Amino acid sequence: MLTQEVELNMQKSVEACQRNFNTIRTGRANTSLLDRLTVEYYGADTPLKSLATISTPDSQTLAIQPFDLGSLGLIEKAISISDLGFTPNNDGKIIRINIPPLTEERRKQFCKLASKYAEEAKISLRNIRRDAIEKIKGSEKDGEFSEDQSRDQQDSIQKITNKYINEIEKNLSGKEEEILKV
């Protein structure tokens, strides 16, 4: 049962890492670039995807069509002041964002950011492993497990950890390749 719980928690960490990877620019338009953008709408920070439809008409353009045209200016302002580095073009109905090609320096910065996200996910996996092993050792002290059962459980947890760390490494190398591809 503990191994299933560990596996589930580790899978969630890998998924969180992948969501972080999706927010990194690769030089191509991708709607997930705006996932973390919030707009101050009626005094509350509201996620952009709750206020508008975001689409990619071509590989270098994002189109944002608000449900309420009154929020157009607020969305444009939120994009302008964000740290995304985009310049929104407002035509009165739709906001278009042209995704500029990435410079070599910017690509390297994004690779470092991807590495940081991967390292955070691996730390999360190691913390999950540590907590599980502490539970196993506690159960061994309480007499619920024999020493051999405890060792088998710990080996099982380590194998699961290695599997998910390898998955994160594979995702990272794929993301770095995507970022560096010109």
Swiss-Prot record:
One of its GO terms (biological process) is translational termination. The keyword Transferase does not apply. It is found in: Cytoplasm. InterPro entries: Ribosome_recyc_fac (IPR002661), Ribosome_recyc_fac_dom (IPR023584), RRF_sf (IPR036191). Keywords: Cytoplasm, Protein biosynthesis. Its main location: cytoplasm. Disulfide bonds: none annotated. It comes from the Bacteria. GO terms for cellular component: cytoplasm. Pfam families: RRF. One of its GO terms (molecular function) is ribosomal large subunit binding. Belongs to the RRF family. Responsible for the release of ribosomes from messenger RNA at the termination of protein biosynthesis. May increase the efficiency of translation by recycling ribosomes from one round of translation to another. PANTHER family: MITOCHONDRIAL RIBOSOME RECYCLING FACTOR PSEUDO 1, RIBOSOME RECYCLING FACTOR. This is Ribosome-recycling factor.
